[in-house]
Structure formats: C-alpha cells, structure tokens
C-alpha cells in the first residue's frame, strides 16, 4: 500500500475536528498519539469501536497518550453520530476529537485507504512525540479492532522507547513480564545497562542471542 509507513513523519496537515481546527504536529507534540480511521459514521462496527475507545480512554490517559479519530464525514455528522456511540456504550463519553474529511483529501496523505474497497480504511497509527509513525494496523471493514491488543502494542512501544530501544518485547508479552535484550547490545554492555541481571537461553547454536531481563 503506497503512502507513509513506519518511521515516516506524518504530514503537518491542518485539520477540522469535532473540537476545533489544529495542525497535526501541534496535537502530537510532547506525547504519543493513537490516530485511527473508520470507514464511515453511523455504521455498526465503527460505532462499537469508537465506543470502546471512549471506554478505554482512562487507560490511554494514564499512559499520557492522546486519541484522534478520522472519517470521511463532516463535523456535524460526527457530532450527531457521537450521540449514538455514547448511548450504545452506556454513557462512555467521546471526549477525543474526530477529524472531518468529507472531500477525502486527508486519508490518502495519512495512508488510511482500504486498497480493496478504495475508501476509508479501518486503520490505526501509533504516532510518537516526534510525529513519526511507530506502528500501524490495517483491518478490513469486516473486522473490528481489539483494544487490548492496541494497548499491549502501545505498552511495548513505550517500554522500548523508555530503554532507548535496547530491549524488545517477545511474543504475547504483557507489562510486568520479562523483555529481551537487543542483539546489538553486547554482554558487557548488558551488565552495565541491566544491573539486575539477565538470563541467556541455552540453545543448540550456543550463540547466546536470546537474553531475558526484568525492567520497569
């Protein structure tokens, strides 16, 4: 799929939202942001997703992470739809802004186009404070996102960033579980970086590349 991808800087577009107008880089500044698009207002899967984002808002807040939605409908449509979202989700308030893109000018620049349906996709970018894309998900219109996986992936990115990307998170990792040390870090460096110690897996190759440690 053409367009911006991992490591690319999100273009500093001026956007109109359900809150106000702003430039994307101003919104991204000094925090991580979950930027997510949906195929359309007043659609079933999207209603459940945006409601779940509202319900999980406290989880993003405590991580210092902002939310920002996007759809190819106008601001008034978004505001009317929010009433349905909040009613269906038992009052969870949609307090995050939703970008309006009725002319479909923004989604191509953010690489949020469904290549099969040639319309707005169910995409999600996790954007760092440097306005660069750190992770992307792209789902077909038939499949809703899993908020727990979004949080898990976000926690992984935050943990790696905290340790200058000298660690990585293994399969099915969750917070408070061991991480692995980057192969770029020598054992001598690892001893200094991780005074709590690390365990090297005893594998047939004897290459010593799989090292687990505890971090916080």
Curated annotation (Swiss-Prot):
Reaction catalysed by this enzyme: a hydroperoxide + [thioredoxin]-dithiol = an alcohol + [thioredoxin]-disulfide + H2O
Pfam families, per database record: 1-cysPrx_C (PF10417), AhpC-TSA (PF00578)
Induction context: By abscisic acid (ABA) and oxidative stress.
Assigned keywords, A-Z: Antioxidant, Cytoplasm, Nucleus, Oxidoreductase, Peroxidase, Redox-active center, Stress response
Positions of the catalytic residues: 46 (cysteine sulfenic acid (-soh) intermediate)
Annotated ranges, domain Thioredoxin: 4-159
Tissues in which the UniProt entry reports expression: Predominantly expressed in seed. Expressed in endosperm, embryo and aleurone cells. Also detected in young seedlings, abscission zones, stem branching points.
EC number: 1.11.1.24
A single MF term (Gene Ontology): thioredoxin peroxidase activity
Motif (Bipartite nuclear localization signal): 191-214
Gene Ontology CC terms, in alphabetical order: cytoplasm; nucleus
GO biological process per UniProt: maintenance of seed dormancy; response to desiccation
Cellular compartments annotated: Nucleus; Cytoplasm
UniProt function note: Thiol-specific peroxidase that catalyzes the reduction of hydrogen peroxide and organic hydroperoxides to water and alcohols, respectively. Seems to contribute to the inhibition of germination during stress.
Family membership noted in the UniProt record: Belongs to the peroxiredoxin family. Prx6 subfamily.
Other comment: The active site is a conserved redox-active cysteine residue, the peroxidatic cysteine (C(P)), which makes the nucleophilic attack on the peroxide substrate. The peroxide oxidizes the C(P)-SH to cysteine sulfenic acid (C(P)-SOH), which then reacts with another cysteine residue, the resolving cysteine (C(R)), to form a disulfide bridge. The disulfide is subsequently reduced by an appropriate electron donor to complete the catalytic cycle. In this 1-Cys peroxiredoxin, no C(R) is present and C(P) instead forms a disulfide with a cysteine from another protein or with a small thiol molecule.
Protein name, entry field: 1-Cys peroxiredoxin PER1
